[in-house]
Amino acid sequence: MSEPGELSCVRICKQAEETIVARRQNLLIGVVVGIVVVAALTYATGLSKQLLAPFGSSAEYKGSESATAPELATGEWINSEPVKLNDLRGRVVLIEFWTFGCYNCRNTLPFVKSWDDRYRAKGLTVIGVHSPEFEEEKNVEHLRREVASLGIRYPVVTDNDYQTWNAYKVKGWPTVFLVDKQGRIRWKHVGEGNYDEAERQIQKLLAEKES
């Protein structure tokens, strides 16, 4: 027959064992939750970099590499009557895919506006293609107010159904295309940055003779 002291020891040992098991279970749950959180953050960060591309990447197209720029899909136009790229042959066209809720786009905007001011009279046409990220950005009147508030003077066209976005195979905001006087895509930049190179490309295309 067990003594009271022995029973007390058994209870204490059993309680200690249960405590250790519970702690191990909690630790395991914590590790699993931590792994899930890290994986989710990693995915979200990768997705953000893919869509917003803050560090930027550029590509130049020459000769046979250059393709004719797809026509802009029909949408609501702000600051202009509807524009057709075919009607802009003989001018260099800068097409920027953006959305007013994108902070990367807002960081890029002062440069795009300055190029419009500096080179419009020299043969550059800037067109903003507004491809919304969120549902509320599809409201045309809201977009009109944002365009006015941001001091954008160049034409902006809505792309709420992403037809133009898909035609140009855009992956993120902002994305800039430079189209030469023959209507061919000659340069592309995704994300922020590389503004000096963008301006050099504009100057180079403006200097080219129309063939």
Task: Locate each region found by the language model.
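Thiol/disulfide oxidoreductase modules built on the thioredoxin-like
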Residues: 148-153, 158-203
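A short beta-strand-turn-helix
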Residues: 71-93, 119
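Loop/turn elements at helix/coil->beta-strand transitions in domains of secreted/extracellular proteins
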Residues: 89-93, 121-125, 151-154, 181
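Short, hydrophobic alpha-helical segments
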Residues: 202-210
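N-terminal targeting signals for export/organelle localization
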Residues: 2-71, 211
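Structural microenvironment flanking redox-active thiols in thiol-disulfide oxidoreductases
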Residues: 106-150, 157-167, 200
